[in-house]
């Protein structure tokens, strides 16, 4: 068995062999820390099938292949496809799809994998420039119960933030409405080649059972409206969102929310009350 991919010397060797330079435009930073990839895979509930976004040269994919029955990995960069065929040749449970994850039919793929392998999870070191759109596709278009991702530390803090903290915003409400969000551990810049200027964190989203059956896109839109200008009161933001003063006051009264409060003081449940009053 060859050396692990996620060690500095092997990664360097692979990058040199294929003349690869990490592409900033694709958010490429390759993990070179075997402990981190192992821990991420172990904690991701990937026993059945696991979907990875952006396998890069295969550092995390390798650990996922060892821990799960099947890995489906979407890679946007065509130049990495032959590299992955080489680095992951020992693993016959890995399917690499050369595609932009944001364009992929993930609902059908999830269904297919669930039928075949019993369960589907997500585990990825996400490209930073598309972290939020990727996560929201998975949140809204699949019912995947466990999503474990490495993201920039600041972004991870926003996902996991509690009300009345500077990081708390629409992103926190939207993710915590659907998931229990847990920061697992920090990953320093030196764990990557090339090292990014910022630290990262691994965040795990566990889908909540029994989420009220509402139009989540409409709810999220209203939440974004309530947070639009953070310094304004919820009344002022809602008034602009609805383009109607009276309606905004009535909705807040019906929801039992004091109009002078600001969105960052409101819990997810309180924002849901506003949405329900609106409907
Ligand atoms: N998983 C590898 C690792 O941990 O070493 C690479 C992670 S790197 C931060 C992000 C990876 O996502 C790169 O391989 C990049 O080419 C790929 N990527 C970027 N945008 C993508 C997209 N829209 N769809 C699929 N892959 C994408």
Describe each region flagged by the PLM.
Residues 207, 225-279:
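C-terminal lobe and adjacent flexible extensions of AdoMet/dcAdoMet transferase-like proteins
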Residues 1-225, 253, 264, 273:
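Catalytic cores of RNA-modifying enzymes
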């Amino acid at each position: 068995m060859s050396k692990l991919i996620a060690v500095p010397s092997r990664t360097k060797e692979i990058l040199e062999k294929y003349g690869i330079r990490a592409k900033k435009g694709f958010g490429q930073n390759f993990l070179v820390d075997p402990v981190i990839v192992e821990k991420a895979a172990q904690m991701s509930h990937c026993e059945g099938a696991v979907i990875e976004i952006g396998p890069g040269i295969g550092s995390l994919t390798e650990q996922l292949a060892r821990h799960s029955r099947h890995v489906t990995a979407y890679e946007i960069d065509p130049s990495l496809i032959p590299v992955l065929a080489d680095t992951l040749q020992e693993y016959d449970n890995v399917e690499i799809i050369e595609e932009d994850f944001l364009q992929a039919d993930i609902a059908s793929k999830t269904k297919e994998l669930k039928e075949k392998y019993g369960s589907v999870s997500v585990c990825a070191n996400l490209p930073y420039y598309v972290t939020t759109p990727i996560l929201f596709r998975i949140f809204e278009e699949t019912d995947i119960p466990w999503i474990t991702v490495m993201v920039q530390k600041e972004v991870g803090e926003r996902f996991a933030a509690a009300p009345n903290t500077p990081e708390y915003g629409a992103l926190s409400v939207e993710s915590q409405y659907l998931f229990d969000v847990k920061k697992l551990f920090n990953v320093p810049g030196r764990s990557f080649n090339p090292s990014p200027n910022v630290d990262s964190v691994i965040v795990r989203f566990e889908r909540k059972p029994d989420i009220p059956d509402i139009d989540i896109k409409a709810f999220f839109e209203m939440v974004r409206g309530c947070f639009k200008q953070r310094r304004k009161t919820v009344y002022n933001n809602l008034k602009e969102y609805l383009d109607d003063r009276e309606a905004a006051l009535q909705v807040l009264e019906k929801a039992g929310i004091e109009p002078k409060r600001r969105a960052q003081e409101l819990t997810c449940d309180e924002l849901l009350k506003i949405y329900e009053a609106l409907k």
